[in-house]
Amino acid sequence: MAELRALVAVKRVIDFAVKIRVKPDKSGVVTDGVKHSMNPFCEIAVEEAVRLKEKKLVKEIIAVSCGPSQCQETIRTALAMGADRGIHVEIPGAQAESLGPLQVARVLAKLAEKEKVDLLFLGKQAIDDDCNQTGQMTAGLLDWPQGTFASQVTLEGDKVKVEREIDGGLETLRLKLPAVVTADLRLNEPRYATLPNIMKAKKKKIEVVKAGDLGVDLTSKVSVISVEEPPQRSAGVKVETTEDLVAKLKEVGRI
């Protein structure tokens, strides 16, 4: 059991506390000079892998991130939390902005095969695009079973038991390893990296590779036409009677 290896995908996103601003040309959002951090769902995925390692159920944790050189900061955070080594799939900034779930899934699938991992952990979604697709696509490319929105993960021999919340209650899945698991908010509460572990993380290895080295084509078939701010909410109008309300609703075409 202790020979299991886990690959954890971590994404660098604009920090959740930052107010998002759209570029003047509406081609995307402003990222230059903006604070970034690890996607919160990815933090949960890292934490779960580390907890399994602390229970001596996982031997090695590899953190991987796709994007520009700044992604190494995100990988260092994962290393400080307890991951053993990192892989940075270096993608230039302009190309990284158009990176979609399918392109990332192709990279992760190749790395999972190359590293011969037994578990692939991801956050269920990223807070920047909210796609909730990468884990499912990766499982499809690998032809591995998947447990999405995991709120509890238990290793049982050559299987992983995943408990997930659904509309009608809880669903329990048993997946034969290797498998893909995506983390939901209720799975755990990620730890803060301590200063000693942050210092140790600086000495841990981060391997830098190109997507081409993995034989992955990052060409996207999806193009962004325009990114716009949400419309401003218009001021409300007070009405005195029900008749006035009905008349006003008819006036604006609501009824």
UniProtKB/Swiss-Prot annotation:
Predominant localisation class: mitochondrion
Residue numbers bearing the N-acetylalanine modification: A2
Reported modifications of this chain: Methylated. Trimethylation at Lys-200 and Lys-203 may negatively regulate the activity in electron transfer from acyl-CoA dehydrogenases.
Entries under Gene3D superfamilies matching the protein: HUPs
Compartments where found: Mitochondrion matrix
Keywords attached to this entry: Acetylation, Electron transport, Methylation, Mitochondrion, Nucleotide-binding, Phosphoprotein, Transport
Membrane-spanning intervals of the chain: none
CC terms in the record's Gene Ontology section: electron transfer flavoprotein complex; mitochondrial electron transfer flavoprotein complex; mitochondrial matrix; mitochondrion
Gene Ontology terms: biological process: amino acid catabolic process; fatty acid beta-oxidation using acyl-CoA dehydrogenase; respiratory electron transport chain
MF GO annotations: electron transfer activity; nucleotide binding
Modified residues (N6-succinyllysine): K210, K248
PTM-bearing positions, type Phosphoserine: S223, S226
Subunit structure: Heterodimer composed of ETFA and ETFB. Identified in a complex that contains ETFA, ETFB and ETFRF1. Interacts with ACADM.
Protein name: Electron transfer flavoprotein subunit beta
Organism: Mus musculus
